[in-house]
Amino acid sequence: TCNDDSFLDDAAKAGDSRWVHRPRIDWERAERRRIRGTPEQRIFEGLKHLIAVRKTTSAFADFNNRELIDVENPHLFALLRTHPALQGDSVLVVANFDVNAQFLDLEGLSKRGYFRLGQVQDLATGLSSALSNGQLEIPPGRFYWLTEHRALAGF
């Protein structure tokens, strides 16, 4: 449920608009997360996966290590997370807020030392993408947690 304005009927909550995003939980619907193939199950499993990835990615540790990145595209929001002690461990979080695919130009980041190998990996999906002329296509409404893909030597 989005934007539940029933909080306005409670005098103790009416002055605090944060309650608009805190609707009552429909526990029957929540239980559907256990039924394979339901939207509730797919969302629940997806969130569990993202939490697991965050827990194993040191750049996501809370060191107040967020840097907003101007990618010169008004439809894309980007921020860089870098572990302060492990400078090579960085994640570029990029989200496309447009209804059309957008292109992320990583050439500027390459000049700053990021994504020089020409291939990036999305930590959220595990998929790697080769860059074409320093451009990466971001589908509409999608986000990526990008890190530089490093092939293991000898494998």
Please report, for each region that a protein language model flagged, where it lies by residue.
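Generic detector of short alpha-helix boundary/capping microenvironments
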Residues: T38, S129-A130
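Generic hydrophobic-segment detector
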Residues: L86, R116, A130-S132
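Loop/helix patches that line or flank the sugar-binding groove of alpha-linked glycan CAZymes
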Residues: T1-Y114, I138
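Solvent-exposed beta-hairpin/edge-strand motifs
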Residues: G108-G126
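C-terminal beta-strand-rich structural cap/linker in extracellular carbohydrate-active enzymes
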Residues: A130-F155
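Short, surface-exposed, polar/charged, turn-prone segments marking secondary-structure boundaries
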Residues: R29-E31, V120-L123, E148-R150
